[in-house]
Swiss-Prot record:
<dbReference type="GO" id="GO:0102158">
    <property type="term" value="F:very-long-chain (3R)-3-hydroxyacyl-CoA dehydratase activity"/>
</dbReference>
<keyword id="KW-0276">Fatty acid metabolism</keyword>
<comment type="similarity">
    <text>Belongs to the very long-chain fatty acids dehydratase HACD family.</text>
</comment>
<keyword id="KW-0472">Membrane</keyword>
<dbReference type="Pfam" id="PF04387">
    <property type="entry name" value="PTPLA"/>
</dbReference>
<feature type="topological domain" description="Lumenal">
    <location>
        <begin position="96"/>
        <end position="100"/>
    </location>
</feature>
<keyword id="KW-0963">Cytoplasm</keyword>
<feature type="topological domain" description="Cytoplasmic">
    <location>
        <begin position="123"/>
        <end position="142"/>
    </location>
</feature>
<keyword id="KW-0812">Transmembrane</keyword>
<comment type="pathway">
    <text>Lipid metabolism; fatty acid biosynthesis.</text>
</comment>
<feature type="transmembrane region" description="Helical">
    <location>
        <begin position="143"/>
        <end position="165"/>
    </location>
</feature>
<feature type="topological domain" description="Lumenal">
    <location>
        <begin position="33"/>
        <end position="51"/>
    </location>
</feature>
<dbReference type="GO" id="GO:0005789">
    <property type="term" value="C:endoplasmic reticulum membrane"/>
</dbReference>
<feature type="topological domain" description="Cytoplasmic">
    <location>
        <begin position="1"/>
        <end position="11"/>
    </location>
</feature>
<feature type="transmembrane region" description="Helical">
    <location>
        <begin position="185"/>
        <end position="204"/>
    </location>
</feature>
<feature type="transmembrane region" description="Helical">
    <location>
        <begin position="101"/>
        <end position="122"/>
    </location>
</feature>
<dbReference type="GO" id="GO:0006633">
    <property type="term" value="P:fatty acid biosynthetic process"/>
</dbReference>
Length: 221
């Protein structure tokens, strides 16, 4: 029975990784094609649906960690996925005013290259039991450039959205109401920005540690 469940797990994770890989490959292709043909102002319109699908599919990774399908700690996975979902739905989907900014293009390209490398790496690992050495190096080295460009784009887009969040009062809840509860999305977004200050360096150091362990292990093998 344990052997059968192991096979089911590997088949499921193989399919999951390659399906999401295909989604991010589509995002990258559409972003680059649109950038070349009509400019960065139109990139979001071209990639909106594929981006939403590919990024929202990452929610399953939290469940994978919770039920033990993968060894990735939820404490590391949750903030990464949470911040991306916040950008995808809370900023880009909700505030069209920022969609034509060039930071959308740098964000999407940084995210998609990162995820194409990551999902194909784990796709090979689950399907074949290993990944090529060059793929391992890419998996644990590409973040050195792509994480800073991605984070810079995220912070920039959140900052650009702040005036529109404040004037629209979208997602804010004012008193009085039946629940006797108030919520200000503008100040919540400022709090999210503040979390980036300690959170980004911490995550970068975490990934540097991952890189050191993974590459050291590959040299020993």
């Amino acid at each position: 029975m344990a052997g059968f469940l192991s096979v089911v797990r590997r088949v499921y994770l193989t399919l999951y990784n390659w399906i999401v890989f295909a989604g991010w490959a589509q995002v990258l292709y559409l972003a680059i094609t649109t950038l070349k043909e009509t400019g960065y102002e139109n990139v979001y319109d071209a990639i909106e649906k594929p981006l939403q699908l590919a990024q929202t599919a990452a929610v399953l990774e939290i469940l994978h960690g919770l039920v033990g399908l993968v060894r990735s700690p939820v404490s590391a996975t949750l903030p990464q996925i949470g911040s991306r979902l916040f950008l995808t739905w809370g900023i880009l989907y909700s505030f069209p005013e920022v969609r034509s900014h060039f930071l959308v293009t740098s964000l999407v390209i940084s995210w998609s290259i990162t995820e194409i490398i990551r999902y194909s790496f784990f796709g090979f690992k689950e399907a074949l039991g290993f990944a090529p050495s060059w793929h391992l190096w890419l998996r644990y080295s590409s973040f050195l450039l792509l994480y800073p460009t991605g984070i810079t784009s995220e912070v920039g887009l959140i900052y650009l959205a702040l005036p529109h969040i404040k004037t629209s009062e979208m997602y804010s809840v004012r008193m009085p109401n039946i629940l006797n509860f108030s919520f200000d999305f503008f100040y919540a977004t400022i709090l999210v920005l503040a979390i980036y200050v300690p959170g980004s360096p911490h995550m970068y150091r975490y990934m540097l540690g991952q890189r050191k362990r993974a590459l050291s292990k590959s040299k020993r093998e």
